[in-house]
Amino acid sequence: VGYEKLVGLISELHTEELDPEDLNRLFMEFVEKVTDLFGFITAVYCDSAEQVLIRGLRTAAAQRNKGDLKIANAKKNRINDRIFCFTSLVAQNRFLYTELCETLEDALSMAVWKPDTVELERLDDGTSDIDTLDGFEYSYERDMKKYMNHVE
């Protein structure tokens, strides 16, 4: 597909209390699920504020013979830039997602702007799934310019 369309393939949300070992196990189960369904993963981008957890994910990947999987810090572009890129793709019918993206669909449908402010700021008060939105945005933010500059 190149940069013609952005396609959400699969999403999961785990709301239970997780310790680092649980996180590593669930992460590797997700990696296996994605590779079984779609063939391969080249990179995973994580919230840079979680360096200890990122090191744990790298260790878990290496222990499961997935040491070639790039697990790196997200670029963390401005949130509004990520949102505007995504909404532009939606407006141009350039965003698709599979039936395996129920949690992403829910997160996108519940995202709202913070009320009572003139600034465009996404509401982050626990009423919507910001973690899924951030994770999804981290997956395409490094390529935003390529998506926005794509000409058919």
Language model feature labels by segment:
Residues 141-152:
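Acidic two-metal-ion nuclease catalytic site recognized across multiple nuclease folds
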Residues 2-125, 146:
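Mg2+-dependent endonuclease catalytic cores in nucleic-acid-processing enzymes, primarily RNase H-like
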